[in-house]
């Protein structure tokens, strides 16, 4: 099938920011560099994934039932693929050059060739396929789904080879390739589950200290710390990834859906549906919020790409603001 048959091409040009918009974040730890329009995209936007080889990233346009492809070098939308069912999680697997798109609406995982988004395979998980992670060390793709499991997919065959059972539906999870463990947010069970990937089973839990709705998660592998953001109350909890000991517990913005570590600057970025990105700085084991960067209400998903040294925030369409990706440059 040709590219034109599956992709509706867009001509959205990069938006030149007015001086006032640039000045609003000038001197801040995150400076707004560009706004990339996504075209006629309505509703909620979920997660993002990057393809560094082609300098492009993929956008799960959940409310639009589509997948967007953005050219990072040109700061413009390249194409969009319609016909999905509430896409949530995305992962790019470089060894096979395949994009994995997890759909909440029908529980499927669509495997698409990254070059032109033509279909390679479809895996039926049954319900609520969600976050996607690439396990490079074990050459596997993991997808959280249903009432409580991580599906394990072999990228060479494109087939599901195992399930790792959990107590309830998994939200964000991270893989520690150095230890062969995964840490999984399971909010309906009120816990963070520790998984042994070689055994394919849960081996323990970390405390949540009475906090609820743990959705975003990041792993600071170098410092051996796990960063988890809760929505009720809105808190950033920092744990030792070795034993779950609490290192920090600080207030953050509401309705968070993504958190990232900037190892170069010892910072943490939390994107929130409250319409802000919280910026924390780590100093001698303590975490202090140094700024709160305004975005747009419901702009709660984001992607920090260390190789590009940029934070990309997904902004859904609203009165006065079209759907787009806001590009922030960390400073200094």
Residues of each region from the PLM?
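Predominantly soluble domains enriched in secretory-pathway, periplasmic, or organellar proteins
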Residues: 18-332
């Amino acid at each position: 099938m040709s590219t034109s048959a599956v992709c509706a091409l867009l001509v959205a040009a990069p938006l030149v920011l007015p001086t006032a918009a640039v000045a609003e974040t000038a001197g801040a730890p995150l400076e707004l560099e560009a706004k990339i329009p996504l075209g006629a995209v309505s509703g909620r936007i979920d997660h993002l994934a990057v393809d560094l080889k082609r300098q492009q990233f993929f956008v799960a346009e959940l409310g639009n039932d589509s997948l967007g492809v953005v050219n990072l070098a040109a700061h413009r939308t390249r194409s969009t693929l319609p016909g999905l069912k509430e896409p949530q999680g995305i992962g790019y697997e470089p060894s096979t050059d395949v994009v994995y798109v997890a759909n909440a609406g029908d529980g499927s995982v669509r495997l698409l060739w990254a070059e032109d988004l033509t279909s390679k395979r479809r895996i039926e998980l049954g319900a609520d396929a969600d976050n996607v992670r690439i396990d490079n060390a074990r050459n596997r793709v993991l997808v959280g789904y249903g009432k409580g499991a991580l599906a394990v997919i072999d990228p060479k065959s494109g087939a599901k080879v195992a399930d790792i059972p959990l107590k309830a539906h998994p939200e964000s999870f991270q893989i520690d390739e150095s230890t062969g463990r995964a840490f999984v947010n399971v909010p309906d069970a009120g816990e963070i589950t520790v998984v042994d990937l070689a055994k394919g089973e849960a081996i323990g839990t970390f405390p949540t200290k009475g906090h609820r709705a743990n959705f975003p998660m990041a792993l600071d592998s170098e410092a051996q710390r796990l960063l988890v953001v809760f929505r009720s109350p809105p808190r950033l909890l920092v744990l030792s990834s070795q034993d779950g000991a609490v290192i920090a517990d600080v207030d953050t913005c509401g309705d968070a859906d993504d958190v990232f570590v900037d190892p170069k600057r010892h910072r943490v970025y939390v994107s929130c549906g409250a319409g802000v990105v919280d910026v924390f700085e780590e100093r001698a084991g303590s975490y202090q919020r140094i700024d709160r960067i305004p975005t747009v209400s419901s702009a709660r998903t984001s992607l920090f790409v260390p190789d590009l040294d940029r934070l990309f925030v997904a902004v859904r369409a609203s009165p006065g603001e079209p759907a787009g990706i806001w590009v922030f440059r960390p400073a200094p």
